[in-house]
Amino acid sequence: MLARFPLYLRLVRMDKPIGSLLLLWPTLNALWIASDGRPRWPLVAIFALGTLLMRSAGCAMNDYADRDFDRHVKRTADRPLTSGKIRAWEAVAIAAVLSFVAFLLILPLNTLTKELSVVALFVAGSYPFMKRFFAIPQAYLGIAFGFGIPMAFAAVQGTVPALAWVMLVANVFWSVAYDTEYAMVDRDDDIKIGIRTSALTFGRFDVAAIMLCYAVTLGIYAWIGATLGFGLAFWAGWAAALGCALYHYTLIKDRERMPCFAAFRHNNWLGGVLFAGIAAHYLVAGAAGN
């Protein structure tokens, strides 16, 4: 078992934290906004660890669902499950254990949060199979990656206001943007094996669609900032996020594989500076109030 542990870590992408960070930033945005910038630190820890566990479980299930496809894709052919280094039942078992541990984390929270976690588990578990049926599975991914948003509001406020769903919509558009960049890397392989992705669905309009999704995401956050009366600290973070999106255009405009992958990875910075702007606003507002 210990000898296989490094393989299990690769299966759940512990060597590639970018996915966990892309889940974490929107969840932190929600926690800070829901609590007016004063989230309880145990709650932050629960959601941060839960995000890591559920992303890891999702990776295991994704590899299980795609095991017959991944061997035909150069980038994924050496994954532990695809290459036969671990067995299919091991991936399912790991996903189940991680999901169970994540559920244990939220047991101290209110009933609504636990009920939403069941929905989140269903969405996360079913996402890997959407690529067979749905022309833009990245939109479904956005729901899966963003379900920490309504859960965060539920945990803090005991209800899920309209603002939480608006933030979830923003996350869907952001996910379509960055995961289309990711899908552009595998475009040729996906055509060959018949998997549906937004990069194929958008076709020659892929770059335009990505930039439109960034515009909608940042437009929604601008509306949130204006509605909630956020100050200059937020707008500085928002402007930095806009700069990141414009930088991504320079990377993806020629549709080359490695620059597209670099744009995908750079979304960590976009999410990070946007959260930094939100957190900084509450920090400045709190200092001014004192």
Swiss-Prot record:
GO molecular function terms here? 4-hydroxybenzoate polyprenyltransferase activity
Q: Which cofactor does it need?
A: Mg(2+)
Which GO biological process entries does UniProt record here? Answer: ubiquinone biosynthetic process
Keyword annotations: Cell inner membrane, Cell membrane, Magnesium, Membrane, Transferase, Transmembrane, Transmembrane helix, Ubiquinone biosynthesis
User: The organism sits in which domain of life?
Assistant: Bacteria
UniProt pathway: Cofactor biosynthesis; ubiquinone biosynthesis
Report the main location listed first in the record: membrane
Q: Does the keyword Magnesium apply?
A: yes
Give TM regions: 41-61, 89-109, 133-153, 158-178, 202-224, 269-289
Annotated membrane topology: Multi-pass membrane protein
* Annotated disulfide bonds: none
Subcellular location(s) per record: Cell inner membrane
The cross-references to InterPro entries, in alphabetical order and at most eight, read: HB_polyprenyltransferase-like (IPR006370), Prenyltransferase (IPR039653), UbiA_prenyltransferase (IPR000537), UbiA_prenylTrfase_CS (IPR030470), UbiA_sf (IPR044878)
Q: Which Gene3D superfamilies match?
A: UbiA prenyltransferase
Report the EC code(s) recorded for this entry.
Answer: 2.5.1.39
Any one of the GO CC terms: plasma membrane
Reactions it catalyzes: all-trans-octaprenyl diphosphate + 4-hydroxybenzoate = 4-hydroxy-3-(all-trans-octaprenyl)benzoate + diphosphate
Described function: Catalyzes the prenylation of para-hydroxybenzoate (PHB) with an all-trans polyprenyl group. Mediates the second step in the final reaction sequence of ubiquinone-8 (UQ-8) biosynthesis, which is the condensation of the polyisoprenoid side chain with PHB, generating the first membrane-bound Q intermediate 3-octaprenyl-4-hydroxybenzoate.
Family the entry assigns? Belongs to the UbiA prenyltransferase family.
Which PANTHER family does the annotation name? Answer: 4-HYDROXYBENZOATE POLYPRENYLTRANSFERASE, MITOCHONDRIAL (PTHR11048:SF28), PRENYLTRANSFERASES (PTHR11048)
Designated name of the protein: 4-hydroxybenzoate octaprenyltransferase
Instruction: Report the source organism.
Output: Burkholderia vietnamiensis (strain G4 / LMG 22486) (Burkholderia cepacia (strain R1808))
